[in-house]
Amino acid sequence: ERGEENNGDVADDKEVKAEENISDAVQYPVEQKWWTEALDTVKSLGCKSVTMAKVPAFAPHDTEQMATTYAAYFERVAALAAERGMKFCYHPSSAELKATDGVSFFDLIAQKCDKEKVWFQIDTFEALQAGVDVISLLEQYKGRVLSLHLHDRSVVCDSGEIDFDKVIKRGYECGVKLIIVEQRHFTLPPMNCVERSLQNVLTLASVRL
């Protein structure tokens, strides 16, 4: 009886693996076609990098598996980007930066991805929401953070919760190449917020033009 049960289990396992292989065989060409078209478009615009922001929500117990899955996915996209002379960046959300038992989804991605292939874009407000110190993050992943999103609760520099001057200075020291002012939340008319954010950033001593 045990032998029959085991044979059944083995057969089931083979069926599952076969289904997974079929799924992968279907998925990757579709994925590659989409990214090929997207990257060709981005390349035609003169961009030197392309960024993917956050991943679909997942349960805490799936963190390790999701990190393994997305690390492999990011490396495939990074390879396609590299063929076009571009770099691929991953922009983690606050949920992906927040640590559980001392490690975050972002930490796992960083561990699993080749540091020569996958780069990072760090958002100051997402880090704030996650309770993560941006300076420490830049230092921990020195040389791997390609760009920064200067992002505040509303107008950049107005909340006083983030030392943007210090973040920019340390970012440059840690290899950041691109700095972007992000305006997502508005306490004034949108264009007023954008103008004020830009003006605030341009007054910082650390900014290089």
Which residues fall in each region the model found?
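Active-site acidic/histidine proton-transfer and metal-coordination neighborhood
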Residues: R2-F120, M191
